[in-house]
Amino acid sequence: GFAGELAEKLNETGEQLRRRNEIIARRDTARTDWIAGVSHDIRTPLALILGWGEQLQQDEALPAAARQKAAGICTQSEKIRSLIGDLNLTSKLQYGAQPLRRKAVTVGPFLRRCAAEFYESPAAGDSTLELELTQAAEHTVVQADEALLLRAIENLLHNTVGHNAVPVHVTIRADAADGMLTIQVTDDGQGYPPAVLAVLQAGETGENPPHILGLHVVEQILAAHGGTAAFAQALPHGAAAALTLPL
């Protein structure tokens, strides 16, 4: 009868959906595994290039021009290494293959560590950074994956210094209120290009979407923690990112 035919059709549809979901899951797993494999294969030769570049950079027997070129090789190699890390991480976060290793993270010491690592990075150049923490934020403890949260802040800082032709001043502000931790990263540079901001704020990609992998990873990390990442132009000029995390 009609009921029997309907049940048969529903079962058929359910089986088709199940098979389709299996295919999608296998495809996603294959993509994640492929990216992880390629990332792993690139790391070894890249480490050699970086090591040799550093040796040449420090070799006083070489002319200054050659040492300067070696420094450029090191800088670009670091950019490639960061890009590979972001590519691997965004894939894992997208398909739920990146476990969150949550632990108690005290905000004050964590942000001071971010600042110290920024100054130790060659990418910082002559840029400067200051921290402004409220008393509440200083001692606030958030349950988070510290390594991922550090990556999010690193990506914001590297984006800031990497997309400005001259050194910039970066400010990291933090406050805790109403069950939320807010971390703001602002700079006094040229700000986000309009095309980048259109993608970040409204998801408008256009025909030639800008490459915002590093900032997309920031969004994914915050989303994985149940938080948000918002981007805007700073006033009078510069870029501003606001990260929020539930406490």
Region locations from a protein language model:
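Acidic ATP/Mg2+-coordinating residue in the GHKL
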Residues: 187
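Short helix-loop "hinge" at the ATP-lid/N-box region of the Bergerat-fold HATPase_c
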Residues: 159-161
